[in-house]
Swiss-Prot record:
Complex formation: Homohexamer. Organized in a ring with a central cavity.
Example of a GO cellular component annotation carried by this entry: cytoplasm
Family that this chain belongs to: Belongs to the peptidase S16 family.
Highest taxon listed in the record's lineage: Bacteria
UniProt protein name: Lon protease 1
Domain Lon N-terminal: from-to ranges: 49-245
Assigned keywords, A-Z: ATP-binding, Cytoplasm, Hydrolase, Nucleotide-binding, Protease, Serine protease, Stress response
Reactions mediated catalytically: Hydrolysis of proteins in presence of ATP
Start and end residues of each Lon proteolytic domain: 633-814
Amino acid sequence: MTDDRDKTNEDPEKIIEADFNPEDPDDADIAEDAKEGLVVATDVLPSTLPIIPLRPRPAFPGILTPMVFTGEKHVALAKRAVDTPSKMMGLVLAKEVDEPDSLENLHRFGVVGRVMKVLHTDDDSIHLLVNCLERFSIRELTESEEGLFARVDYHYATELSVNPELKAYSMAIITTLKELVQINPLYSEEIKMFLNRQSMDDPGRLTDFAANLTSGDGQLLQEILETIDVRNRIDKVLVLLKKELEVSRLQTKISKQIEQKVSAQQREFFLREQLKAIKKELGLEKEGKVSEIEKYQKRLKNLTLSEEAQKTIDEEIEKLRLIEPSSPEYNVSRNYLDWLTILPWGKFSKDNYNIERARRVLDRDHYGLKDVKDRILEFIAVGMLKGDISGSILCLVGPPGVGKTSIGKSIAAALNRTFYRFSLGGMRDEAEIKGHRRTYIGAMPGRFIQAMKSAGTANPVLMLDEIDKVGASFQGDPASALLEVLDPEQNSSFRDHYLDVPFDLSNVLFVATANQLDTIPAPLLDRMEIIRLAGYILEEKLEIARRYLIPKALENHGLKKGQVTIRKDALRAIIDGYAREAGVRNLENRIKKIMRHAAMEFSQGRTDKITVSKKDVAAILGKPIFTEEEVFEDVPGVVTGLAWTSMGGATLQIEATAMPSRNKGFKQTGQLGKVMVESSDIAYSYVMAHLEEYGADPEFFDKHFVHLHVPAGATPKDGPSAGVTMATALLSMITGKPVIKKLGMTGELTLTGKVLPIGGVKEKIIAVKRIGLTTVILPEANRKDFEELPDHLRENLSVHFAGDYRDVYQVAFG
């Protein structure tokens, strides 16, 4: 059985309270009969009762309880009780709501009830109005095919002499009930019905009524039902009523807050509507649609539109006039017009082609990078002669942290143009570039049209960051969509899917950035002018730290100039031990950590000035990440190669060894990529074919198994430039001769012994200087690259250029 106060638990066979209306004549007669005592405690009650399990709360004596019986078993039991002369049944609370009916799942106290009214329905359920009479305890409980039956002992309500204490407690219950009625009027009808049937001078009946009135937990109510002593029962009911009172107060408070909020919103709505009507009558405000159209027409006066765009906007405005504002199509049309009229059609910022000013801006924002700055100044000079720099698409390629993005900002500042940047990294949807068609819900233009809106001019500098990291998926290939945008012959009439009218992007200066070119599709790469940023050498990093990074870090950490001094030897230690990458991002992070350390010292009053020297670096920054690169000298079969990664230059110690074996063979280890494995195979074949020429045993490979290893084994490696180094390691191992001291080499080797050019000469020379090598072998074709390096990189180096491996051999083995 459930009632309106608790309907959270449902059971396939259950009994719930039905509607009982005291205004109904039949129901009123029943109530009157109960009041007149047609069923009273002195009636003879049967000693054996059919038991109906109740869920989720018990019934109480003296209460008229409407019930609905569902489920074949419960309906049969109810009908059997109705058909008996006494029309009585035992109502007992089940222990567990979700458990089926059983002997173990029943409490041992219940209420006997007499059926007062029966109503049959078409849904195989039966509605009863039951007058609950007296408590009983179960003496014996049995189960048969017909259901549960119990022999019971009744606990009749006895007339008590109402002493002052009981009367006081009864008045406390009545007072609490009155408070409940004042807070929640829903209780008033039930209290009125009770007063019509019972006397307030009966404390027992009063406590039962009060307990039944609450929404307490079923097990707690069962405990009250089982309390025979009226005085103890009153204590428990009073506690329950106080809780009910607090809940009712809280519910009332919440209801009032909600009503006040709703009322305030309604009041504000009505006032706004009245204000709108008053303004409309005074001519101070026009209808929303009219004002929207006037807004678009006002925008159009300041734009220079193409013929197609003008026609499209005019047609869309006429369409908007005919659409009701409540229509979903109205918002679609309005958003479309918003985009069309907010774009900078024909709006240009005036370019500044002053070369000296551009040079000052570039020098102010960046240290070094002379070749890059010269290329940008040349680019601006050409624009000055032509009168515009339309159709230009630059691609800045270099390691992370070398200033690619900031160079784009400097270009915009030098030209007096608006700068806008967005990242292409991880973009996998072609609609991100060309927009979504307006038929889709939530459609919007692509990133380029959004950028033009944000820039506010038709000739901004748009930076396409991380263009080498564009992806592809089933939603399309953004790199292919970029072909139209970055083609000077096509982007003058770029057609976004959302706008569906051509927009001129030919006056935009596109500046793309990338860490590498390998992942950029060839057609896209062909449309861009490549400018390489090789990275910074140690001396440049020192100067960048002194001029830019340290002053910026001081300001960002609330420190004054002179409070923190980082000596040059400390900066060198930081660069060598913590920030060897080509850029300065890690160097900046380490300087920030020093500033945070200083801020902590100052805030705790330990000192007011800090000077950081080389010996202090490890204490502040922790153990160095990079250790000194060890060069193995006088060891046959070990040669130092030069490598180039996206993080800058590095050295590789290539090792070769051989084991006497009847089964000749060759294997490589060290996580080598496909290209590097091919280079090792070429080196192996070349050495095998020229053993006699280099004074080695021509049958060496027939009698040995050869192993080539490139540490560190956990780091993946690839590229063709280690070919000459691998061949030299093999020859050194076979002949037993070590190479000369402090030697590094790089170059791609062919099967015929030709040495082909490689990339990253500057980065590799930086690595050479860092570990202290003095002799370097480079491909002859890279002579020009080496000669373009700054003097401080070339000095104190003995550089040999090789066009054939024989040149390498002569230098390596003296």
